[in-house]
């Protein structure tokens, strides 16, 4: 696998270890304070990013830039999820302390991430398409310029939407034969399979295997079953909404919110009001728990006109993020 980034600005590089979590979190907090990202990371989040998953190997997947005083000043991480079948994706994440920017650190870090991403993609599947991906909040022009100069292309624009809950919330309504039920663990596998089917026509989506699903969706620490719902037609899953509470984001965004991570409707049940009923149920559950808003994200180019559904229910844009990529 790829060697560490080249020496730059006096930093020495080594993999991130579990013993680095506290110092690494301090670095991430300094970056967040400067950049005001949509997502905030707790120390536990960093532990999971580094170690939670059988496919993860921090000695291979991560790097930490240490200054002469032993203080972390930059980091990088590359992840290829198991189970990609259409396009193998390498997700790159990293950052540079605000006081260490403008010294070429980010450029070298990105070059290392691309090299490692290419190697991990080739190891996962020697033939077939792959893509190295970097997400960035809209308006971070320095990062966008860095990506442009490295040959990455802007591939997608994602909107983050918010909906206040102190105004009228519609009642869930479904045609005869469909049932809206709260999510429960016994539905996990059926919902996973429904999700893989529902998202098969979405750009950049790949099937979720059981481990990834249980660790990062319905088994995650932020997942809230009481805010999550499933629509059944007999015993078949027609649609689902899975919502989480990312409380570490609330102070920065200025309100409490439930974030709908996944909303999907299988093709035979589209245009039947299933998505509307699921979101209505979610909003009502959030309001009953005293939550101020319902939030979610959407691809501007969603093939099923999801944005029309959301705006019709009162969701409005709050911020944007961009997906940059390079096909390999």
Regions found by a protein language model. Name each.
Residues 32-56, 76-85, 203-263:
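A conserved beta-strand-loop-helix scaffold within acyl/acetyltransferase catalytic domains
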Residues 66, 79-81, 91-105, 260-270, ...:
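A short, internal acetyl-CoA/4′-phosphopantetheine-binding micro-motif in the GNAT/acyltransferase core
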Residues 102-119, 262-265, 271-288, 293, ...:
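Conserved acetyl-CoA-binding loop-helix of GNAT-fold acetyltransferases
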Residues 143-147, 310, 315:
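Conserved active-site tyrosine of GNAT-family acetyltransferases
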Residues 1-50, 172-208:
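Short amphipathic alpha-helix that is part of the acyltransferase structural core
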Residues 59, 69-74, 155, 236-239:
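Glycine-rich acetyl-CoA-binding "A-motif" of GNAT/NAT acetyltransferases
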Residues 159-179, 292-307, 313-328:
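C-terminal "cap" of GNAT-fold acetyltransferases
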Residues 1-5, 80-176, 322-326:
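Acyl-donor-binding surface of acyltransferase catalytic domains
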């Amino acid at each position: 696998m790829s060697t560490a980034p080249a020496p730059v600005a006096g930093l020495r590089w080594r993999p991130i270890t579990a013993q680095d979590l506290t110092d690494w979190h301090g670095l991430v907090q300094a970056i967040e304070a400067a950049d005001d990202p949509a997502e905030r990371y707790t120390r536990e989040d960093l532990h999971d990013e580094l170690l939670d998953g059988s496919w993860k190997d921090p000695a291979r997947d991560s790097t930490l830039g240490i200054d002469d005083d032993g203080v972390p000043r930059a980091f990088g991480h590359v992840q290829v999820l198991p189970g990609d079948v259409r396009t193998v994706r390498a997700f790159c994440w990293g950052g540079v302390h605000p006081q260490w920017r403008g010294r070429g650190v980010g450029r070298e870090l990105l070059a290392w991430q691309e090299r490692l991403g290419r190697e991990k993609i080739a190891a996962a599947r020697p033939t077939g398409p792959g893509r190295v991906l970097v997400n960035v909040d809209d308006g971070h022009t320095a990062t966008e310029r860095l990506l442009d100069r490295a040959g990455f292309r802007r591939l997608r624009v994602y909107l983050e939407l918010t909906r206040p809950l102190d105004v009228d919330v519609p009642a869930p309504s479904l045609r005869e034969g469909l049932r809206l039920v709260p999510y429960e663990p016994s539905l996990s596998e059926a919902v996973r399979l429904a999700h893989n089917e529902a998202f098969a026509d979405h750009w950049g989506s790949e099937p979720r295997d059981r481990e990834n699903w249980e660790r990062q969706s319905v088994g995650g620490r932020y997942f809230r079953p009481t805010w999550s719902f499933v629509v059944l037609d007999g015993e078949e899953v027609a649609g689902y909404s899975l919502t989480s509470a990312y409380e570490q984001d609330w102070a920065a965004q200025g309100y409490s919110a439930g974030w709908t991570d996944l909303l999907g409707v299988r093709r035979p049940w589209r245009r039947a009001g299933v998505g509307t009923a699921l979101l209505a149920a979610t909003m009502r559950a959030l309001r009953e728990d005293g939550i101020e808003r319902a939030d979610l994200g959407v691809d501007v180019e969603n093939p099923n006109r999801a944005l029309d559904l959301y705006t019709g229910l009162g969701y409005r844009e709050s911020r944007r993020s961009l997906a940059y990529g390079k096909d390999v």
